[in-house]
Amino acid sequence: MSLQSIKYKRGSLEILDQLLLPVVSKYLPVRGVEDGWKVINKMQVRGAPAIAIVGCLSLAVEIYPEEFETKKSLRQEIEGKLNYLVSARPTAVNMKISADELITLANELSKNDDVTVANMKQRFLDATEAMLEKDIADNRAIGSNGAKAILERVAEATGSPGSASPVRVLTHCNTGSLATAGYGTALGVVRHLSELGKLEHVYCTETRPYNQGARLTAYELVHEKLPATLVLDSMVAALFRVKNVAAVVVGADRVAANGDTANKIGTYQIAVVAKHHGVPFYVAAPLTSIDLQIPSGEHIIIEVRPDREMTHVGEHRIAAPGINCWNPAFDVTPASLITGIITEHGVFKPSTLKDEIAKLIEL
């Protein structure tokens, strides 16, 4: 059974504090937008899909007990608070896209004379809550599409179409139930391979400096009893040389229109090594992680985190006092290194991504 990182019922929101994992499992109440901003910014909740869901639901929790005299005041509250939430972690595009959708909805409802203030509030709450269920459904579709793509590629490479043997895969950072509403994106692909009986082994990187792989992905894999091994970030090249890894599958915080992908720091170097060893490299991401307004990775804003995340583990200093640090939270993997981008609507080559997504948006 997958872990539950988000607990929600109308008027109440709790998140599993991921800074305490894997030692302590503790849920934190999120009573409104200020709490939502803080848990996102402090990375007590993380993963682009989860950030968007928690951010939007924190506003739903805040608005639920409030009374608004006019639709205009409700619209202004929604717009102002959502724009504030976007600032908590700007690299992850999902929060911005979700905020824009909800702001558009609020504007449309406020202009509709047939909609009362109470109706407008109700429909806003319904829309935010629908995001939770949609994310889980999208993740399951991503898992199915990704597993199929990997198995088909392996079968083709081994000359045995339709009958691929169980595979070994590598994943980076955390993209499972803890990073989404449930099931996961890249880890959802791993889960689906397991459900098909086609997962021989999954390797997860520690993912320094925040150790999301060691603390969170390993926690999920052990919880679900999947065959898994933790490796250091610096071991990936050696792993590819000796362990016959069939594919790499990672998540994404933002995918540009040309397929360039911003993801957790360390993703780029894994893609370079995968290319050298001929290992297919897949990005698993919902459409909400794809930003067609960004032409390439050069235009993606990369969040830089505090030095302390590198110099300390918990309260213990591990680096020499006085040393300078450079701590970007993400890097950008060029589209040329990406085999395919796995979405809930299929697997697309980076070169055709923009046109394929544009077609889907038109439907």
From Swiss-Prot:
It catalyses: 5-(methylsulfanyl)-alpha-D-ribose 1-phosphate = 5-(methylsulfanyl)-D-ribulose 1-phosphate. Pathway: Amino-acid biosynthesis; L-methionine biosynthesis via salvage pathway; L-methionine from S-methyl-5-thio-alpha-D-ribose 1-phosphate: step 1/6. Keywords: Amino-acid biosynthesis, Cytoplasm, Isomerase, Methionine biosynthesis, Nucleus. Its EC number is 5.3.1.23. One of its GO terms (molecular function) is S-methyl-5-thioribose-1-phosphate isomerase activity. Its main location: cytoplasm. The record marks C173 as: Transition state stabilizer. It is found in: Cytoplasm; Nucleus. It is an enzyme of class 5 (isomerase). GO terms for biological process: L-methionine salvage from methylthioadenosine. GO terms for cellular component: cytoplasm; nucleus. The active site is at D253 (proton donor). Catalyzes the interconversion of methylthioribose-1-phosphate (MTR-1-P) into methylthioribulose-1-phosphate (MTRu-1-P). Belongs to the eIF-2B alpha/beta/delta subunits family. MtnA subfamily. This is Methylthioribose-1-phosphate isomerase. It comes from Drosophila grimshawi (Hawaiian fruit fly).
